[in-house]
Design a protein with these regions (language model features):
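Hydrophobic pocket/interface hotspot
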Residues: 37, 45, 49-50, 57, ...
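Short, low-complexity N-terminal intrinsically disordered segments enriched in polar/charged residues
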Residues: 20-52
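Surface-exposed, charged secondary-structure patches
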Residues: 74-116
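Solvent-exposed loop/turn segments at secondary-structure junctions
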Residues: 56-58, 106-107, 142-143
């Protein structure tokens, strides 16, 4: 077996470092925002979920930003343990706007095992503001496309 030339190996390492440092695409940034919100629920940090909501956020039944925050805080009080499992995210970016649809499984409880669980189909609408995405519309339903 022939040794790999040092210059070639350094070149490959340099390319990997540059790729890791490159700016993320809008879709990557959107997916990262969704993941951060997921982690915010699981880590019981409501601010991580509420921060990316636009001031004019509108959810199911006319729920506004404050309504969603109250719902989240109520669930955190009800469930000591919460798990959020995202299905594949189908994202579509159109300039400064984006739509992301996915299935999410939510489970919660206070003991060793989850006592409650539900699967939702979620459709979200986002707009770019600076270098971040703000969620301005969300619809969710039980197992059916919203």
């Amino acid at each position: 077996m022939q040794p790999i030339p040092v210059n070639w190996a350094l070149g490959v390492v340099l390319l990997l470092v540059l790729a890791a440092c490159s700016r993320s695409t809008p879709e990557q940034a959107l997916r990262q925002q969704i993941t951060q919100m997921q982690l915010g629920v699981e880590q019981r940090e409501p601010s991580a979920v509420i921060a990316p909501l636009a001031e004019d956020f509108l959810g199911n039944g006319g729920m506004d930003r404050q309504g969603l925050e109250r719902l989240l805080r109520a669930q955190l009080l009800l469930n000591q343990n919460i798990e959020v499992v995202l299905g594949p995210v189908q994202a579509h970016i159109d300039g400064e706007n984006a739509q992301a649809d996915f299935t999410v499984m939510l489970a919660g409880g206070n003991g060793r095992f989850f006592e409650r669980g539900r699967i939702h189909q979620v459709s979200t609408h986002w707009r770019a503001q600076g270098d971040q995405w703000l969620l301005y519309r969300a619809q969710w339903g039980d197992g059916k496309q919203p």
